Amino acid sequence: MEVDDGSRATPPLDAVAAAFKSQVMELQDLVLARSMFPATALPDLANVDALVTAMESQVETISRRLQEELDAIPKAKKLVQRSLKEEEKLQHMLANLPSGMRKNDFANQHEQSSSRMLPHFNSSFTEANECELKIKDEPVAAPRKGRAPAPRWYISTEELDSLSSYMRGRLTLEKVNIAINEVASYADANAHLVTCPKKKLSEDTWEKALELRDIAASGAVKGNHFFLEADIKGPGLKLDNTGKAILTVLRHLGRFHEVRIGHHRVFILSKQA
């Protein structure tokens, strides 16, 4: 048994000795090669070192670029999510847009649809529109060029159906959405008057503009689009029973909230979430 164990232990020792001898011979060959060609070996080694350094630099550059791309992925995902959210909002608006306000109707019967769908404003609204056309030449109005229009957050069929029959009454989707477009037009007209210079307005309109500016500067209204109860004059929304029912529905669905400022009842439009 002992002899057998000794014979089994011998081959591994021989293998280690052979491997050690092989390493020694390789080192000897390398020493000989270096001593035989010293003049050519050093430049070659220098070239190899330069190439390796250049490759390391390229690898570092690639690694840095990859890290930049990885860091940009979360930002790109957020941008895609925002785009999808905006697309949902636009699809919701398009699906619930009153038929009389669609593009084809405007293309075929622009005058008729304009008179049917948009409210007939008084002289102050007309002057506010003229002011907007001229305001580009007015230095004080330059910072407000990018002001967004009043929000038009149309309701959907599902929202209308979710109301109690008592609240819904005889209201239709089209009637309510036409009213939404109309009150947004009131808010746009007020925003124009708030920003329009005095020299562009008549004396009567200027007095109203000053009053609107005081309202716009109040804490509850500041930074938001608004209209007054006094602005409601039709044709799509009037202060009759139907109009009051529409206002109740819009308030219930969160399209606006109202505050009392002085003797005015002020409706502040909500933005779509």
Swiss-Prot record:
Keywords: Coiled coil. One of its GO terms (biological process) is attachment of mitotic spindle microtubules to kinetochore. It comes from Zea mays (Maize). GO terms for cellular component: mitotic spindle; outer kinetochore; spindle microtubule. This is SKA complex subunit 1 homolog. Residues 77-97 form a coiled coil. The keyword Cell cycle does not apply. PANTHER family: SPINDLE AND KINETOCHORE-ASSOCIATED PROTEIN 1. It holds the Pfam family SKA1. Belongs to the SKA1 family. GO terms for molecular function: microtubule binding. It comes from the Eukaryota.
